[in-house]
C-alpha cells in the first residue's frame, strides 16, 4: 500500500492498523524499498506494532510474519486481517479469523469513493511487481463496477 501511494486508505477504512513485530522488522530491513523504510521511520498515530503473546502452531506456516499476524489478529479480535498469501489466508480462515487481501482493501476504498480509478491503482500494483493474480484483480474490478452500477441504478430509482 505504501509503494503504490494508497496507504492513507487504511485509516479511512479501519479505525487502526496493528502489525506484529515480525512484520515491522520485515518492513524496515535493508532489502525493503526505501519508501517503505522512510514511512516506517515516522508512522502515523493510527498505525502500531505489537508482539503477539502466543503464536499459532509454527508447523502451519513457514513465514513468521504470517504466523504472528494470525496470532495477533486472534488476540486483539481484529475485524479483519490483511493477508494475500493463499496458504496463510486459508489457515487464518480455518482459525476463525476474517481476512481481506490487498485487492479487497483497494476495492472497498474505491467503493467508498476513496479511490477514483481502481483500474489505475491495479496497474500500480502490477508496476510495483506486487504478487497478486490477474484473476483476483479482474474479479475485484468487476465487483467494484457492479457496485457502482447498482448505486447508479439506486439513484435513478429514487
Label for each model-derived stretch:
Residues 97, 101-147:
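Hydrophobic alpha-helical interaction segments
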Residues 1-80, 86, 90-98, 120, ...:
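Active-site-proximal, substrate-binding regions of enzyme catalytic domains
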Amino acid at each position: 500500500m505504501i509503494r503504490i501511494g494508497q496507504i492513507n486508505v487504511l485509516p479511512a477504512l479501519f479505525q487502526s492498523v496493528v502489525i506484529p513485530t515480525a512484520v515491522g522488522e520485515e518492513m524496515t530491513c535493508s532489502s525493503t524499498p526505501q519508501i517503505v523504510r522512510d514511512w516506517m521511520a515516522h508512522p502515523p498515530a493510527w498505525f502500531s506494532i505489537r508482539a503477539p503473546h502466543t503464536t499459532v502452531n509454527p508447523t502451519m506456516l513457514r513465514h513468521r510474519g504470517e504466523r504472528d499476524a494470525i496470532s495477533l489478529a486472534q488476540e486483539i479480535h481484529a475485524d479483519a486481517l490483511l493477508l494475500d498469501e493463499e496458504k496463510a489466508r486459508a489457515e487464518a480462515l480455518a482459525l476463525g479469523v476474517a481476512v481481506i487481501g490487498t485487492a479487497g482493501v483497494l476495492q472497498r476504498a474505491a467503493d467508498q469513493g476513496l479511490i477514483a480509478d481502481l483500474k489505475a491503482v491495479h496497474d500500480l500494483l502490477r508496476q510495483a511487481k506486487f504478487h497478486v493474480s490477474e484473476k483476483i484483480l479482474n474479479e475485484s474490478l468487476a465487483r467494484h463496477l457492479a457496485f457502482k452500477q447498482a448505486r447508479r441504478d439506486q439513484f435513478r430509482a429514487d
